[in-house]
Amino acid sequence: DALPIHEKNEVSYKSQNEGVMHACGHDAHAASLLGACRILVNHKDDIYGKIVINFQQAEEIGYGARQFIDRGLVKNVDRTFGMHVSSAIETGYISLTPGPNNASVDWFKIKVKGKAAHVSTPDAGVDALYIASQIVCNIQGIVARLSSPMDNVLVGIGCLEAGQAYNIVAPSAEMEGTVRCLTPEVRKKTKEAIERIATNVAASYGGEVSFEWKDFTSPLINDKGSCLEAAQVADVVVGADHIITDRKPALGGDDMAEYIIVSPGCYGFVGSHKKGDSKTGVAHHNEYFDIDEDCLLVSVAMYAGYAIDYLNKNK
């Protein structure tokens, strides 16, 4: 889960692989889970039940969790629990927010088929470039006019390619974009609207469209009961006044969502920004990303504490 970023931090644990670095904290996640494993093994005789510990790959591309699920590694699991470091939260604080926390992530490609002609006779062709530009503009109306202002919806086009030469009506065009939503219902409605609008716009100018979709991850919706259980542990680890229960949802995705769909669960966000230290406050996916390592102790205590507490209360 390293990212294709050249690390610029000058630290002993700087990436040894040119052009890639851990710029989102997945190395910290693995370290904290290993620490929790050590505690759990040392106290295995005091634990009533079975604990499945997943060191999951491929979160950054959105398919790792489904590989674990498809292989039955979370079958018959009563609770799921995970944690992610956050440079937006001060060290010593934990977000255990029920409900939507992260958006679904869908990638799409729209191909527009037109017909080439000389630019002096546009009526003899079908301008795929013009059609594509109208699709880009019109699908923004999904957010502005077809979605409730109370719903968090994002439709973004990041790539558009069309045309062969300045004096030829473009015979084809392609665009790539993403859809981000916080609920399955809004997600379904938005995807349907994109296809409907693009198809109708293309038909209006004599063109045709085709679609490709990739479903990277579902919306991450924390189970309320699981959050309350985790909060009881966090009360001991960091104190009740350091528990955040109203973190604003993010439109970035996380495939921890897939586990929570299978069994009730909670995904917490551990503060990794040391107060007064700008280096640990750098945004994720940045070449200077780093953490306050004190946050690892919090993560270790939460992982081990929640597992032991839940199993012993439900033995």
Which residues does each predicted region cover?
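Membrane-embedded catalytic cores of phosphoryl/pyrophosphoryl-handling enzymes
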Residues: 38, 49-52, 177
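Short, well-ordered alpha-helices that flank and scaffold nucleotide-derived cofactor binding pockets
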Residues: 38, 42, 70, 305-308
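Metal-dependent amide/peptide-bond hydrolase catalytic core
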Residues: 133-315
